[in-house]
């Protein structure tokens, strides 16, 4: 059975893991790193860059570099590059394609199936968008699982037989989740989950960026945020300073030639202490504790009931974050696994469960938000409460609001507010051909069915006539199957283009190498190569050079082969020339004194 890989599609960094020999291992990317920046860039000549290469050129190409696209998943947001609109799903698919290709290179086999993680507090629209991104990238997404649950798997707490309660605090680059789980004997039951899809490491960077920009403006009267290149340099510096302050009490931000005042270059040079950084970001740390308190309340627990605290996400390296969690729960958080890698490791373990490679492990996750429909007066009537274990199915009977009503509009909502307008509209459909009757007489059964991915299916049935209508809630971006197929085809085309581009570069490099070797050999042989031979070879060299930039790999390879044959002839000439040198015969004479060893021919038949 083919491998089901585990992917942590992160806001700032992504990772991929796979089961090998019964263990979940991180797959290094083509650059040799264990995580890949979730960054996509388009160069001015149309080349598409993903990951490390995209990040390296961000300062010089900020307007065509896309970061933190995960925050826009499930929305109508578009990125316009050269007049073409890209959806968040498409950009995410480019990142997934890179992870897929790196894994295939690592394994030496094709990969088509994956488990992808999402923040526990992702809505149905965001989950569906993630699944669509996987489809565009050429992956069959076998399961969408919540990041905190995946992290809990990675910590290996399933190996403990005693039941105990665990809190997973997951602060990533762009999102925050907290989940309370009861685990033991291979069973993971999520009791409650809360979160904030707009809180993460990016916000900590932004606080420091704004402080640096404000201080610079006070001193020089220039707002660095108004220039894209200066802002990108400042952003990178803020991120690096944040990382350094996780292990040091102070750091220096030094950006020479960051701007100019009246034609004179000005530089930014500023010392930042950890205490200053903590002061700037204290409101963000406090903001992360609110969902923790809410999750404890939802689970009906106090902080004393929590036996283990797991920290997940790169932003949990911030000392103030660790201290705040420790102070609230009263326990030292576990830090015995890489917070950037544990989610992907857990996702691969879930992939192992699906293939049968990992046994005796059961995930019981929950839906993060309540689901319901709009009823008379614009009220949201909930059918499935938040923190209900999934998969789940719930039905409720409704009736008509007017005499003779022959159709009803079912508006599917997600959220905790009492009024429909204050919640997220996931989708709507009509149930028609209801027999006319006085209001209150028809019986319409509405059923919500949530699968293990957290994706919602809704149906409505008139119990009198048996008439039924159903729908699967799709992403709010409303990508149809045809649109997704078109995006898949485009992604495949790009993958083929990337492959062809690589082949073209390798073919050109090979040709240039042969040209160099031939020219060097001619030079080494000097006048031992006749002018006629030189002229013939040089004409072949020029013919090859003239088509190097044509992109015609077949022609380049053919002419390279011709030139290679000429190189072999020259090499033979070089060896012949060396053999005819006076020294060669002298060496032969010296060998006349060599004594031949005696030997006896043994007939094998005699020894049988």
Curated annotation (Swiss-Prot):
What does the induction field say?
By stress conditions e.g. heat shock.
Q: Does the UniProt entry include the keyword Protease?
A: no
Recorded superkingdom = Bacteria
Q: What NCBIfam families has UniProt attached to this entry?
A: PRK00290.1, prok_dnaK
What is the similarity comment for this entry? Belongs to the heat shock protein 70 family.
UniProt xrefs under HAMAP family: DnaK
Under what name is this protein listed? Answer: Chaperone protein DnaK
Task: Record the organism.
Answer: Finegoldia magna (strain ATCC 29328 / DSM 20472 / WAL 2508)
């Amino acid at each position: 059975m083919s491998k089901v890989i585990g992917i942590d599609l992160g806001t700032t960094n992504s990772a991929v893991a796979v089961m090998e020999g019964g263990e979940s291992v991180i797959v290094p990317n083509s650059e040799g790193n264990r995580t890949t920046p979730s960054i996509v860039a388009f160069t001015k000549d149309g080349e598409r860059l993903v990951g490390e290469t995209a990040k390296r050129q961000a300062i010089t190409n900020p307007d065509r570099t896309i970061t933190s696209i995960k925050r826009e998943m499930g929305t109508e947001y578009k990125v316009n590059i050269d007049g073409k609109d890209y959806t968040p799903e498409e950009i995410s698919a480019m990142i997934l394609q890179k992870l897929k290709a790196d894994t295939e290179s690592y394994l030496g086999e094709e990969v088509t199936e994956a488990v992808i993680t999402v923040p526990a507090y992702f809505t149905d629209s965001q989950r569906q968008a993630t699944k669509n991104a996987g489809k565009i990238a050429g992956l069959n997404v076998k399961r969408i699982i919540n990041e905190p649950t995946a992290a809990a798997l990675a910590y290996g707490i399933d190996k403990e037989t005693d039941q105990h309660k665990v809190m997973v605090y997951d602060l990533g680059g762009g999102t925050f989740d907290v989940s309370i789980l009861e685990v033991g004997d291979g069973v993971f039951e999520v009791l409650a989950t809360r979160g904030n899809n707009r809180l993460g490491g990016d916000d900590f960077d932004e606080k420091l960026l704004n402080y640096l920009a404000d201080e610079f403006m006070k001193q020089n009267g220039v707002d660095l945020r108004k220039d894209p290149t200066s802002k990108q340099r400042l952003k990178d510096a803020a991120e690096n300073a944040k990382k350094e302050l996780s292990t040091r009490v102070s750091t220096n931000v030094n950006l020479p030639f960051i701007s100019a005042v009246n034609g004179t270059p000005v530089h930014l040079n500023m010392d930042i202490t950890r205490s200053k950084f903590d002061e700037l970001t204290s409101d963000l740390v406090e903001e992360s504790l609110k969902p923790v308190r809410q999750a404890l309340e939802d689970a009906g627990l106090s902080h004393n009931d929590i036996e283990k605290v797991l920290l997940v996400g790169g932003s949990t390296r911030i000392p103030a974050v660790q201290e705040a969690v420790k102070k609230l729960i009263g326990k030292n958080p576990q830090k015995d696994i890489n917070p950037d890698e544990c989610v992907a490791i857990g996702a691969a373990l879930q992939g192992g469960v699906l293939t049968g490679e990992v046994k005796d492990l059961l995930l019981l996750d929950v839906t993060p938000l309540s689901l319901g429909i709009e009823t008379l007066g614009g009220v949201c009537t909930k059918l499935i409460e938040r923190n209900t274990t999934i998969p789940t199915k719930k039905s409720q009977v409704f009736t008509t609001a007017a005499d003779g009503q022959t159709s009803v509009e079912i508006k599917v909502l997600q959220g905790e507010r009492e009024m429909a307008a204050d919640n997220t509209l996931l989708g709507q459909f009509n149930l028609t051909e209801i027999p006319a009757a006085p209001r209150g007489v028809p019986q319409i059964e509405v059923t919500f069915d949530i699968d293990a991915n957290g994706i919602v299916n809704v149906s409505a049935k008139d119990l009198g006539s048996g008439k039924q209508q159903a729908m699967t809630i799709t992403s709010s971006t409303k990508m149809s199957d045809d649109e997704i197929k078109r995006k898949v085809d485009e992604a495949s085309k790009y993958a083929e283009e990337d492959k062809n581009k690589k082949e073209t570069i390798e073919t050109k490099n090979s040709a240039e190498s042969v040209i160099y070797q031939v020219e060097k050999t001619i030079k080494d042989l000097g006048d031992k190569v006749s002018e006629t031979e030189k002229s013939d070879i040089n004409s072949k060299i020029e013919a090859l050079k003239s088509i190097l930039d044509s992109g015609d790999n077949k022609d380049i390879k053919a002419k390279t082969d011709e030139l290679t044959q000429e190189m072999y002839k020259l090499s033979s000439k070089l060896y012949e020339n060396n053999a005819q040198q006076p020294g060669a015969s002298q060496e032969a004479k010296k060998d006349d004194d060599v004594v031949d060893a005696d030997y006896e021919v043994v007939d094998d038949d005699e020894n049988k």
